[in-house]
Amino acid sequence: MIVGVAYAKPTVQVWKHVDVPDTATARDAIEKSGLLDQFPEIDLSTQKIGIFGQICPLEKPLKEGDRVEIYRPIHPEAELLEKRS
């Protein structure tokens, strides 16, 4: 089945389509996408992930067409800058 894996930084957004087995989990799709190699700062032990904006565990089974999203942590400095604008 084909699913998407998305990751965004302030300067770049990546959305890859990957072909995974019908029994694949969100972790499987992320690993197969190559994003962990492309963006070594991704740490799945601390960063949250979701499917279509809904937080989920890495072991969540996927369905055809799902979009797995890797979320970046929000830093307090970013929140302060936003409030000052």
Curated annotation (Swiss-Prot):
Pfam families: Ub-RnfH. Gene3D superfamilies: RnfH-like. InterPro entries: Mopterin_synth/thiamin_S_b (IPR016155), RnfH (IPR005346), RnfH_sf (IPR037021). Belongs to the UPF0125 (RnfH) family. This is Protein RnfH. The gene is rnfH.
